């Protein structure tokens, strides 16, 4: 177990909404179990939330991925209901809204943490982006990605992202 668990974008739109996949739905229970284990061990759990505004389609990302998703305040923007009790429990948990693939606040949020575990959605977009940002900000720290608690846009892209993370000295379980 690492100092901090980062749960990336486990939101309704990525699970069962406009960008949902069967693979994303399949990992929800495993992510919940992992987050509970961290919380029960007194470890911090940080959740990212992909956040777009109503004008999403006119943004750079919206022009390249023209599927409205994770629009602030919508049901699709919400973190999965199965994870809500952990989000709301406080106890070292917080939610970080991010308007792009990666969060640039890890140094502020991590404090003196020296190890991280990352899981969530989508392996080939936001999970890998955050893993590489953490790697750049904390070059000597241990970083683990649990592949059984991640899903990509496709199974092939999931595997490709895992291979890239391994090449960047991120442990993939």
Predicted regions and their residues:
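Active-site acidic carboxylates
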Residues: 1-95, 140, 144, 153, ...
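Short, flexible active-site-adjacent loop segments at beta-strand->alpha-helix junctions, enriched
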Residues: 11, 51-52, 99-100, 122-125, ...
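Internal catalytic-core helix/loop-beta-alpha segment
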Residues: 73-123
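Short, small-residue-enriched loops and turns at beta-alpha junctions
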Residues: 103, 150-154
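Glycine-rich anion-binding loop/nest that anchors nucleotide
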Residues: 115-126, 144-150
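Short Gly/Thr/Asp-enriched flexible loops that form oxyanion-binding sites at enzyme active sites
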Residues: 127-137
